[in-house]
Amino acid sequence: MKYRSRTEIVSEILEVAKGDGVSKTRIMYGAYLSFSQLKEYLSLLLHNGMLSYNKTDKRYRITQKGHEFLRAHQSIEGMLQDKN
């Protein structure tokens, strides 16, 4: 597996968290993270307001700020695509 940048990992986590919300396990498997990596990134995304956590159903959801990050990341990735 190739090296992934921090922004690529964040983008993958946010993609997994779209919709009705997801558990820690779903994020971990969906973004191919170890548990220690998962804890680090969840903390980062919660602190920066890109994910929210619902204590009642124990689910993580992408926020508006998270959606904005995804759109920006996808736009940048599109600009960097090889046009061949």
Where are these regions (language model features)?
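Short amphipathic alpha-helical interaction segments
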Residues: 32-47
